[in-house]
């Protein structure tokens, strides 16, 4: 049977999602758990495919993976989670066709970036985001990774404010390396008045204008989900969702305390 899983993780401790030698990655922990639980023998023999890799420090709520297994009764969230560290958890599973490709069959991907701080002109950021919608050459918004084409299509960009937090949601068919984080940098620069819409239009024409911009920090980015249309009937594991929510609530309390501690460590004249 071929199984698909929805996977979440806090990327802070990992050097990305894709397995690499000598460093901690999400897939390193995932493969270890799947092998130890005898769900798969190896990623290669199980035809393991991931919807898309995330960079070091990037988080996920709805990463999707798929693999073949002779033990589908074990390939369920609460069993797999027993072999994973608390910063990685599976929360939904589904039976899929043997030809299901988690990467190629994706209809769209949804990313969210969280910015802390005030002083952004949100109306300018929203107007600028409209220029990015549709199909464009995003070469100026990517880091070279051997891509054959840098043309991508963005379906939706939403900029909203929640207190002193600004959230930017980006939905598209696929994304280049660092593309979302560089889009966030561009919108932030416009929101601060450093650049304007004419500059953004130039950035979308790399044949006549080239400029490298730094990607926004990885810690603010989360892969929220991958959409496959009506192709998959997901079964959510309420126990795994509730357990992860409880753990994250405890993390939030700890981080709030740490934020106060750091405030105390700031030198005041």
Curated annotation (Swiss-Prot):
<feature type="active site" description="Nucleophile">
    <location>
        <position position="55"/>
    </location>
</feature>
<dbReference type="InterPro" id="IPR001406">
    <property type="entry name" value="PsdUridine_synth_TruA"/>
</dbReference>
<dbReference type="InterPro" id="IPR020103">
    <property type="entry name" value="PsdUridine_synth_cat_dom_sf"/>
</dbReference>
<dbReference type="InterPro" id="IPR020094">
    <property type="entry name" value="TruA/RsuA/RluB/E/F_N"/>
</dbReference>
<protein>
    <recommendedName>
        <fullName>tRNA pseudouridine synthase A</fullName>
        <ecNumber>5.4.99.12</ecNumber>
    </recommendedName>
</protein>
<keyword id="KW-0819">tRNA processing</keyword>
<dbReference type="Pfam" id="PF01416">
    <property type="entry name" value="PseudoU_synth_1"/>
</dbReference>
<dbReference type="GO" id="GO:0031119">
    <property type="term" value="P:tRNA pseudouridine synthesis"/>
</dbReference>
<comment type="function">
    <text>Formation of pseudouridine at positions 38, 39 and 40 in the anticodon stem and loop of transfer RNAs.</text>
</comment>
<dbReference type="InterPro" id="IPR020095">
    <property type="entry name" value="PsdUridine_synth_TruA_C"/>
</dbReference>
<comment type="similarity">
    <text>Belongs to the tRNA pseudouridine synthase TruA family.</text>
</comment>
<dbReference type="GO" id="GO:0160147">
    <property type="term" value="F:tRNA pseudouridine(38-40) synthase activity"/>
</dbReference>
<keyword id="KW-0413">Isomerase</keyword>
<dbReference type="GO" id="GO:0003723">
    <property type="term" value="F:RNA binding"/>
</dbReference>
<dbReference type="InterPro" id="IPR020097">
    <property type="entry name" value="PsdUridine_synth_TruA_a/b_dom"/>
</dbReference>
<feature type="binding site">
    <location>
        <position position="111"/>
    </location>
    <ligand>
        <name>substrate</name>
    </ligand>
</feature>
């Amino acid at each position: 049977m071929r199984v698909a899983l929805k996977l979440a993780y806090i990327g802070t401790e990992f050097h990305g999602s894709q397995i690499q030698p000598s460093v901690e990655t999400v897939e390193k922990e995932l493969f270890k758990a799947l092998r130890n639980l005898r769900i798969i023998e190896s990623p290669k023999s199980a035809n393991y495919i991931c919807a898309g890799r995330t960079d070091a420090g990037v988080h996920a709520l709805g990463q999707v993976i798929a693999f073949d297994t002779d033990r589908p009764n074990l390939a369920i969230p609460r069993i797999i989670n027993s072999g994973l560290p608390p910063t990685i958890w599976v929360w939904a599973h589904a039976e899929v066709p043997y030809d299901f490709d988690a990467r190629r069959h994706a209809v769209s991907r949804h990313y969210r970036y969280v910015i802390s701080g005030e002083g952004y002109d949100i109306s300018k950021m929203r107007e600028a985001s409209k220029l990015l919608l549709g199909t464009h050459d995003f070469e100026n918004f990517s880091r070279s990774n051997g891509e054959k084409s840098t043309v991508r299509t963005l379906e939706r960009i939403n900029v909203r404010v929640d207190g002193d937090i600004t959230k930017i949601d980006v939905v598209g068919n696929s994304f280049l390396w660092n593309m979302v984080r560089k889009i966030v940098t561009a919108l932030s620069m416009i929101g601060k008045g450093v650049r304007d819409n004419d500059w953004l239009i130039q950035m979308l024409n790399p044949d006549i204008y080239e400029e490298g911009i730094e990607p926004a920090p990885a810690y603010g980015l989360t892969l929220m989900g991958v959409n496959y249309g009506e192709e998959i009937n997901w079964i959510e594991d309420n126990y795994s969702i509730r357990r992860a929510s409880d753990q994250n609530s405890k993390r939030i309390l700890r981080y709030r305390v740490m934020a106060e501690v750091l405030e105390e460590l700031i030198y005041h004249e």
